[in-house]
């Protein structure tokens, strides 16, 4: 069973804007596997977004820190 992070993020949506001053934000929550976490984090930040919350969705807490 792989570890999954449940992330909540806010990304500006450029496709739905009618004027230059108006900016719509897309708010979403998704599950990201531990292996893809860094890539997903980079993607959100490059798009000008903000990561609001990160939780461990599955897997044992502290596994990566060597705790049993």
From Swiss-Prot:
InterPro entries: Allophyco_linker, Allophyco_linker_chain, CpcD-like_dom. Keywords: Antenna complex, Membrane, Photosynthesis, Phycobilisome, Thylakoid. Its main location: membrane. Pfam families: CpcD (PF01383). The keyword Flavoprotein does not apply. It is found in: Cellular thylakoid membrane. PROSITE patterns: CPCD_LIKE. It is a peripheral membrane protein. Residues 2-57 form the CpcD-like domain. Coiled coil: none annotated. One of its GO terms (biological process) is photosynthesis. The keyword Membrane applies. One of its GO terms (cellular component) is plasma membrane-derived thylakoid membrane. SUPFAM superfamilies: Allophycocyanin linker chain (domain) (SSF54580). Belongs to the phycobilisome linker protein family. Rod linker protein, associated with allophycocyanin. Linker polypeptides determine the state of aggregation and the location of the disk-shaped phycobiliprotein units within the phycobilisome and modulate their spectroscopic properties in order to mediate a directed and optimal energy transfer. This is Phycobilisome 7.8 kDa linker polypeptide, allophycocyanin-associated, core. The gene is apcC.
């Amino acid at each position: 069973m792989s570890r999954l992070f449940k992330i909540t993020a806010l990304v500006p949506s450029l496709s739905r804007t009618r004027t230059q001053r108006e900016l719509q934000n897309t708010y979403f929550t998704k599950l990201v596997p531990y292996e893809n976490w860094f890539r997903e984090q980079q993607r959100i930040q490059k798009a000008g977004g903000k990561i609001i919350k990160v939780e461990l969705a599955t897997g044992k807490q502290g596994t990566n820190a060597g705790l049993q």
